[in-house]
């Protein structure tokens, strides 16, 4: 299915289904300007995605000899079909950090390194084995490194009469990058900003500050003038400034909830902490989560624990700061609420803490992208 979203440059959306995935579909964008074409993201490397992508490209009569591919980030639902385009002569553009991370992961087994971190934090080995069999990100991602031209923050891609500026927005992945057409106030936000669901912010191997990076990247986008936002998944509606505020509040709530959980269970592993906080799972208990759901929840919990540890709200009983959080020695009157509001003030989140009440915390939900 192809839908035209904008004229001059002509912008189309191809709905790429993601079967058996709560994300439902990927928004693949196709820009056409003065005889040149840019494809943004591809979908998983599986038959249903390939069929939808190439049916859409055929409908738009895309000439691969005058086409480029831009990947907003390394996740398989955005990069999986890259090799299907490179074999047709389409050059690939991608942020240097994510490209290098992807190549290293393919060469050295990045999944295994994350498994060791998760195992050390209480994730059961048998659930990791089950997760490996059903993790679509593993099964349908690129299996081999592909050639790419790497970009950095503020690099400009030229497409016919259009200029697209690369905006590095780390957090969802270390090298996540949005594209911005300034004169049209158009932002292709990838998975950095979604409207119907909340991007998953997880820990990454050798990336110490994924949540801090994400919160900073939200404010970076907030400084741009944006009238049209085209996200990587689901629909787009409402004001991007309001959505940025809502996403910031969501993580404020998650941090407060995790700090409360650690206050009450200071010797718990991150896996145990993840099981004590609220997730959007249609009322199911933690024990009923699938291994994949637990994997994403664990990663997000660790990212928030790392933020709290870096800010001094919690300390670790082992050298690795992701491991075994315990509350620091603080006066009895210093509750988790007071400590957290002090952290918000010192971390430029005071504006949000003033607007947020305890009753709001229980209403926050997370879906994974």
Predicted regions, residues:
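Metallo-beta-lactamase
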Residues: 37, 44-46, 137-142, 146, ...
């Amino acid at each position: 299915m192809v839908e035209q979203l904008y004229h001059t440059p002509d912008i189309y959306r191809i709905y790429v289904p993601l079967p058996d995935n709560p994300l439902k579909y990927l928004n693949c964008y196709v820009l056409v300007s003065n005889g040149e074409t840019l494809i943004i993201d591809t979908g998983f490397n599986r038959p249903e995605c390939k069929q939808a992508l190439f049916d859409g490209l055929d409908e738009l009569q895309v000439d691969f000899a005058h086409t480029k591919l831009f990947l907003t980030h390394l996740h398989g639902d955005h990069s999986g079909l890259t090799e299907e385009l490179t074999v047709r002569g389409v050059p690939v553009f991608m942020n240097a950090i994510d490209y290098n991370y992807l190549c290293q992961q393919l060469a050295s087994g990045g999944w295994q390194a994350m498994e060791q971190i998760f195992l050390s934090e209480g994730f059961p080995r048998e659930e990791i084995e089950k997760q490996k069999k059903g993790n679509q990100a593993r099964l349908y991602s690129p299996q081999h490194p592909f050639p790419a031209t790497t970009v950095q923050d503020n690099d400009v891609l030229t497409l016919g009469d259009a200029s697209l500026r690369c905006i590095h927005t780390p957090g969802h992945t270390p090298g996540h990058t949005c594209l911005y057409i300034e004169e049209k106030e158009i932002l292709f936000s990838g998975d950095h900003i979604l409207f119907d669901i909340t991007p998953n912010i997880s820990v990454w191997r050798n990336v110490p500050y994924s949540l801090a990076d994400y919160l900073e990247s939200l404010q970076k986008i907030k400084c741009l003038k944006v009238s049209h936002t085209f996200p990587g998944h689901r629909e787009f509606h409402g004001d991007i400034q309001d959505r940025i505020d809502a996403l910031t509040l969501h993580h404020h709530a998650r941090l407060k909830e995790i700090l409360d959980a650690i206050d009450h269970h200071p010797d718990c592993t991150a896996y145990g902490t993840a099981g004590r906080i609220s997730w959007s799972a249609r009322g199911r208990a933690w024990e009923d989560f699938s291994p994949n759901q637990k994997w994403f929840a664990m990663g997000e919990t660790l990212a928030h624990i790392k933020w709290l540890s870096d800010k001094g709200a919690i300390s670790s009983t082992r050298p690795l700061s992701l491991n075994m959080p315990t509350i620091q020695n603080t006066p009895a009157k210093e509750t988790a609420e007071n400590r957290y509001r002090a952290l918000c003030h010192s971390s430029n989140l005071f504006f949000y803490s003033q607007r947020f009440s305890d009753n709001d915390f229980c209403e926050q939900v997370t879906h994974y992208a």
